[in-house]
Swiss-Prot record:
Protein name, entry field: Phosphomethylpyrimidine synthase
Residues annotated as transmembrane: none
Swiss-Prot/TrEMBL GO biological process terms: thiamine biosynthetic process; thiamine diphosphate biosynthetic process
EC number from the UniProt entry: 4.1.99.17
Recorded metabolic or biological pathway in which this protein acts: Cofactor biosynthesis; thiamine diphosphate biosynthesis
Cofactor note: Binds 1 [4Fe-4S] cluster per subunit. The cluster is coordinated with 3 cysteines and an exchangeable S-adenosyl-L-methionine.
Organism (species): Clostridium perfringens (strain 13 / Type A)
Isomerase listed as a keyword: no
Cofactor requirement: [4Fe-4S] cluster
Length: 436
């Protein structure tokens, strides 16, 4: 193999099998794809050791992709249940799965996930450090942080979230600028705690080249995490968030010099009127690197419905240029999601991604909508169900209420506008009061 990473191949003009797959899936010219990858504006996360992957591209001009979070925890350590969620995510065509396991047999779960997942896989190695070494956070060494990252890379994960932008300067900015909800990133808060307890610099920032060595070796895509993402709409677009983003932009250029692919992670909680500016800032400060957003969640008052608050923000963010949406489930802020929560979160996020692709003018995005509209005009219910983003729910709702006329529904019955327009345009009479 005459290249180290997908980005290295793109710079050298080498077409990889992963590029061919993405080119065919997206309908994008392969030369255009290669050029955008060489510039860092598109990534194809594909670890050399993830043999079951069906490669996906993330970035400029491509369909908006979605990620599903899952994984075992101390309170919910059932590996088989999490694997059911994996199957659900793959069956529903989620392009990415993040294993956020933080307790118990994390290696066993990760190994099985890599074996079965055709979706790209991400992890947050920081979550795994304490359990892996069975040591208190304060006692973890710099070498141990990097050993866990390499362990995840060797196991075959395609991208890792690393909060390398949380350096001492960012922390000083945090201290000078009071926040309502402080640091809400789990990995970011753990790293902050380690830095404070040991009076040390962030090891992933201080020894960033060591991190790049691992990424280059395994073609591991680096998802630069936003430790200081806003955890409330009150904290959005504040000094510490922007300070960290500037640092991530600087680290992005260093990664690209080593041909390491980069994704930038983003907010978080944010009012709707700030979303466009945040996408613009990321694209400017991080040089066009793909933007991966958690939501954004546009209001803080809807626990139990945060799949809706995040779908609103995600649709807006992606329409303005964000490339990758992390799903949020109805269980967000409340508990670990169950299988039904996962399904609802995927559906909501897929709707947001698709709506954004229409707005962005992604080639072919409107085709399925036009097919659905044509099926509605013809009152072809079977075709409507086959095109629906959640066919199972559509069929169930239809069966729960039987109309008088099978071609209409119980909302309008004989007053169905489509049914009556079809009849009138065909030169037929309509009977609203009489039997047909």
């Amino acid at each position: 193999m005459n290249y180290t990473t997908q980005m290295d191949a793109a710079k050298k003009g080498i077409i990889t099998k992963e590029m061919q797959v993405v080119s065919e899936k997206e309908g994008i010219n392969i030369e255009t794809l290669m050029n955008l990858m060489a510039e860092g504006k598109i990534v194809i996360p594909a670890n050399k050791n993830h043999k079951s992957i069906s490669a996906e591209g993330v970035g400029q001009g491509l369909r908006t992709k979605i990620n599903v979070n899952l994984g075992i925890s101390k309170d919910c350590a059932n590996i088989e249940l999490e694997l059911e969620k994996v199957k659900k995510a793959i069956d529903m065509n989620a392009e990415s799965i993040m294993d956020l396991s933080n307790y118990g047999k994390t290696y066993d779960f990760r190994k099985r996930l890599v074996e079965v997942s055709t979706a790209m896989i991400g992890t947050v190695p920081m979550y795994d450090v304490v359990g892996f070494y069975d040591k208190e956070l304060k006692d973890i060494t710099v070498d141990e942080f990097f050993e866990v990252v390499e362990k995840h890379a060797k196991d075959g994960v395609d991208f890792v979230t690393i909060h390398a932008g949380l350096n001492r300067e960012t922390i000083e900015t945090f201290r000078r600028n009071k926040r309502l909800t402080n640091i809400v990133s789990r990995g970011g808060s753990l790293l902050f705690a380690w830095m404070e307890l040991n009076n040390r610099e962030n090891p992933f920032y201080e020894y960033f080249d060591r991190l790049l060595d691992i990424c280059e070796k395994y073609d591991l895509t680096l998802s630069l995490g936003d430790a200081c993402r806003p955890g409330s709409i009150a904290d959005a677009t504040d000094a510490v968030q922007i300070k960290e983003l500037i640092t991530l932009g600087e680290l992005t250029k260093r990664a690209w010099e080593r041909n390491v692919q980069v994704i930038i992670e983003g907010p978080g909680h944010m009012a709707m009127n700030e979303i466009e500016a945040n996408v613009l800032l990321e694209k400017k400060l991080c040089h066009g690197a793909p933007f991966y957003v958690l939501g954004p969640i546009v209001t803080d008052i809807a626990p139990g419905y945060d799949h809706i608050t995040s779908a609103i923000g995600g649709a807006m963010a992606a329409s303005y240029g964000a490339d990758f949406l992390c799903y949020v489930t109805p269980a967000e802020h409340l508990r670990l999601p169950n299988l039904e929560d996962v399904r609802e979160g995927i559906v909501a996020t897929k709707i947001a991604a698709h709506a954004a692709d229409i707005a962005k003018g992604i080639s072919g995005a409107r085709d399925i909508d036009n097919k659905m509209s044509d099926a509605r005009k013809r009152l072809d219910w079977d075709e409507m169900f086959s095109l629906a983003i959640d066919s199972e729910k559509a069929i169930r709702y239809r069966k729960e209420s039987t109309p008088e006329h099978k071609d209409s529904c119980t909302m309008c019955g004989k007053m169905c506008s489509i049914r009556n327009m079809n009849k009138i345009l065909e030169g037929k009479d309509i009977n609203l009061l009489r039997e047909d």
